[in-house]
């Protein structure tokens, strides 16, 4: 793969294009606009369906008819299509792609090496966001391709920082990322449902129980993320001797709560490895 002269992305004027106009692309675009990282006038995508066109146009994004139009009018291009069609899509657009453009993939399970081979160059960054992107609370992880620069990484950090938090990691860790943050929201949804059911069993009205459960999880997560204390210390702080909390924790420990969560992450990681093994 021949190296091209490096051209920095013009951070003050660059245009962002989405190949694929689904819910995740919409969440990213909305977050970027809402946070002020980019004005909607510098974002574009393509779709022929009225519902998806309306969704993007409702906050000012330019919606074109064809993917090639998006590529020709963008400096940073995010591929957000389904894994089973990404190869075909990238190969179709390959004649229009150049190393003057920064390419980004949020497609699950498709490795950088494959993306680089299909695109014909390696100025690529792979990002794995998760579904809380829809409410601006994504946990995303990125890995840089062979010729993506530190400046490219900073640009993507700023973009995806608009929908939550983003970390940098080696791509070989992405199956484990899938097992933890990719599948993790479903584990937490299950935990919230179980907490609410427990509240109902203890006599609370369903609506109150669900509200208390979801807000408790949100508050506890915020204490871990922002407070600087280890979760074990936070647990100890609230579990007083002979009290209600330690009695509840005792039941969780008898049920193998920690081990079950750990096993869920490991099992999902292994399944990711099986599904996306090539």
From Swiss-Prot:
Pathway: Amino-acid biosynthesis; L-proline biosynthesis; L-proline from L-glutamate 5-semialdehyde: step 1/1. The keyword Iron-sulfur does not apply. Disulfide bonds: none annotated. GO terms for cellular component: cytoplasm. Keywords: Amino-acid biosynthesis, Cytoplasm, NADP, Oxidoreductase, Proline biosynthesis. It is found in: Cytoplasm. GO terms for molecular function: pyrroline-5-carboxylate reductase activity. GO terms for biological process: L-proline biosynthetic process. NCBIfam families: proC. HAMAP family: P5C_reductase. Belongs to the pyrroline-5-carboxylate reductase family. This is Pyrroline-5-carboxylate reductase.
